[in-house]
Amino acid sequence: MNLQAVSCSFGFLSSPLGVTPRTSFRRFVIRAKTEPSEKSVEIMRKFSEQYARRSGTYFCVDKGVTSVVIKGLAEHKDSYGAPLCPCRHYDDKAAEVGQGFWNCPCVPMRERKECHCMLFLTPDNDFAGKDQTITSDEIKETTANM
């Protein structure tokens, strides 16, 4: 887990007396940036390969896209117990996991082969590659500097 410290200053522009106080308050915010476990990444990698074969879809020609999505799914699997789509914004991720609509493969993918994340692409998609496989090393290499 990587931690980032961010400093924020809070000063007052004016006071009721018209005098600007010389004090300001500093607050530090710590943000945790988690990395998914290798086990979850491997589980999601294997799932993605199997689902691509089963659904007749292909990974993006840019394996970086595939890698980022797989890691996002793995991170959500670690955090919430289910591979919630990492390409959408949620007000309440835990509630979304419970509903199941956006758990991968999501309902639009299962019903219409529409993957918002571009993980599973139909052969006629301009961004579809020829591969239905990706190695653990490819995932590590393409996401190393993120």
From Swiss-Prot:
Record's protein name: Ferredoxin-thioredoxin reductase catalytic chain, chloroplastic
Cofactor note (record): Binds 1 [4Fe-4S] cluster.
Active-site positions on this chain: 87 (nucleophile)
GO molecular function: 4 iron, 4 sulfur cluster binding; electron transfer activity; ferredoxin-thioredoxin reductase activity; metal ion binding; oxidoreductase activity, acting on iron-sulfur proteins as donors
Top-level taxonomic group: Eukaryota
Residue span of the annotated presequence: 1-31
Site (Increases the nucleophilicity of the active site Cys): 116
GO terms under cellular component: chloroplast; chloroplast envelope; chloroplast stroma
Native source species: Arabidopsis thaliana (Mouse-ear cress)
Homology family: Belongs to the ferredoxin thioredoxin reductase beta subunit family.
EC number, UniProt record: 1.8.7.2
InterPro entries linked: FTR_bsu, FTR_bsu_sf
Cofactor dependence: [4Fe-4S] cluster
UniProt feature coiled coil, ranges: none
Cited Gene3D superfamilies: Ferredoxin thioredoxin reductase catalytic beta subunit
Gene name linked to the record: FTRC
Compartments, as annotated in UniProt: Plastid, Chloroplast
Keywords assigned by UniProt, alphabetized: 4Fe-4S, Chloroplast, Disulfide bond, Iron, Iron-sulfur, Metal-binding, Oxidoreductase, Plastid, Redox-active center, Transit peptide
Catalysed reactions, as listed in the record: [thioredoxin]-disulfide + 2 reduced [2Fe-2S]-[ferredoxin] + 2 H(+) = [thioredoxin]-dithiol + 2 oxidized [2Fe-2S]-[ferredoxin]
PANTHER family: FERREDOXIN-THIOREDOXIN REDUCTASE CATALYTIC CHAIN, CHLOROPLASTIC
Binding site for [4Fe-4S] cluster: 85, 104, 106, 115
Taxonomic lineage from the root: Eukaryota, Viridiplantae, Streptophyta, Embryophyta, Tracheophyta
Quaternary state and interactors: Heterodimer of subunit A (variable subunit) and subunit B (catalytic subunit). Heterodimeric FTR forms a complex with ferredoxin and thioredoxin.
Function: Catalytic subunit of the ferredoxin-thioredoxin reductase (FTR), which catalyzes the two-electron reduction of thioredoxins by the electrons provided by reduced ferredoxin.
